[in-house]
């Protein structure tokens, strides 16, 4: 498996290890990935992801998976996350029509 966050497409990054004498040696910064199951309250479904802890902290800050997906720009999300976001928007639009809520 590649070391990529399945929600944000974040990948390993490259930089320098700098010693006390200021010598620079190339190094790789790896992600702290964990397998997690996240629950969507709107869709009433569970989704399994391999997510970076940084992303998991952001989801916790936003409140839940639904809020994270709806408040994050689509460009920053992976294809899998974009598909779930589209489903969320569809269900929310359907609920608004059923309740008779209009934007005007």
UniProtKB/Swiss-Prot annotation:
<dbReference type="GO" id="GO:0006412">
    <property type="term" value="P:translation"/>
</dbReference>
<dbReference type="InterPro" id="IPR037147">
    <property type="entry name" value="Ribosomal_bL28_sf"/>
</dbReference>
<comment type="similarity">
    <text>Belongs to the bacterial ribosomal protein bL28 family.</text>
</comment>
<dbReference type="InterPro" id="IPR034704">
    <property type="entry name" value="Ribosomal_bL28/bL31-like_sf"/>
</dbReference>
<keyword id="KW-0689">Ribosomal protein</keyword>
<dbReference type="InterPro" id="IPR001383">
    <property type="entry name" value="Ribosomal_bL28_bact-type"/>
</dbReference>
<protein>
    <recommendedName>
        <fullName>Large ribosomal subunit protein bL28</fullName>
    </recommendedName>
</protein>
<dbReference type="Pfam" id="PF00830">
    <property type="entry name" value="Ribosomal_L28"/>
</dbReference>
<dbReference type="GO" id="GO:0022625">
    <property type="term" value="C:cytosolic large ribosomal subunit"/>
</dbReference>
<dbReference type="GO" id="GO:0003735">
    <property type="term" value="F:structural constituent of ribosome"/>
</dbReference>
<keyword id="KW-0687">Ribonucleoprotein</keyword>
<dbReference type="InterPro" id="IPR026569">
    <property type="entry name" value="Ribosomal_bL28"/>
</dbReference>
């Amino acid at each position: 498996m590649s070391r990529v966050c399945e929600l944000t497409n974040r990948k390993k990054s490259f930089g320098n290890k700098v010693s006390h004498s200021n010598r620079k040696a190339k190094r790789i910064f790896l992600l702290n990935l964990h397998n997690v199951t996240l629950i969507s309250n709107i869709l009433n479904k569970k989704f399994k992801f391999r997510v970076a802890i940084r992303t998991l902290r952001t989801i916790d800050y936003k409140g839940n998976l639904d809020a994270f997906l709806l408040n994050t720009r689509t460009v920053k999300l992976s294809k899998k996350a974009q598909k779930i976001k589209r489903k969320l928007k569809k269900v929310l639009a359907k609920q608004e029509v059923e309740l008779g809520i209009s934007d005007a």
